[in-house]
Amino acid sequence: MRILLVNYRYFISGGPEKYMFNIKKMLEDNGHEVIPFSIHSNKNVETEYSKYFVEPIGSRDATYFEECKKTPKVIWQMLTRSIYSTEVEKAIKKEIKDVKPDLVYIIHFVNKLSPSVICGAKKMGVPVVLRLSDYFLLCPRFDFMYNKKPCEECLTKGYRTCIK
């Protein structure tokens, strides 16, 4: 099976990336072909598929948003990549068209690639598996915490409660 593996980093920076490279190896050891889709970074593991990767928010040297210079362009990119990115959708559709995966497996896309990776895959008719390892779909902070206390207001009152 050809699997397009989507993550917003293609280098180890923490747990999700360790998981990604471990699952990639396990899948390959079991006879599957695993093809990455990610963001350009100077820290990326080399891959022939980097030609499909999208430009990062800010700089290819920055791993975290805090490392980026907060220009209006960077802030705009951060806001739009949180919601939707035509650039990302176009790039993933191009890679899907060229490599013809049987499945898209998404590890992490939040705030860097956007949900457009899901839309692009669905528009191309490729099934999507989305790994959920935190609460990002339900809580903008990812952890249901506010002022070091449990908070579930987004579940009952919606996202507007996170803007106080």
Where are these regions (language model features)?
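A conserved catalytic-core segment of Leloir-type glycosyltransferases
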Residues: D29-L103, F144
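N-terminal subdomain of nucleotide-sugar transferases
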Residues: M1-Y49, K97-V99, V117, A121-P127
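Short beta->alpha connector loops
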Residues: R9, E87, F109-K112
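Short N-terminal targeting/anchoring amphipathic segment
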Residues: K93-L113, P127-R131
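Acceptor-binding helix/loop patch of EC 2.4 sugar-transfer enzymes
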Residues: C68-I75, L132-K164
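Short catalytic/ligand-binding loop motif for oxyanion handling, primarily in non-cytosolic enzymes
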Residues: S13-G14, K43-T47, K112-P115, F136-R141, ...
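Residue-level marker of alpha-helix boundaries and capping positions
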Residues: S13-G14, S82-I83, H108
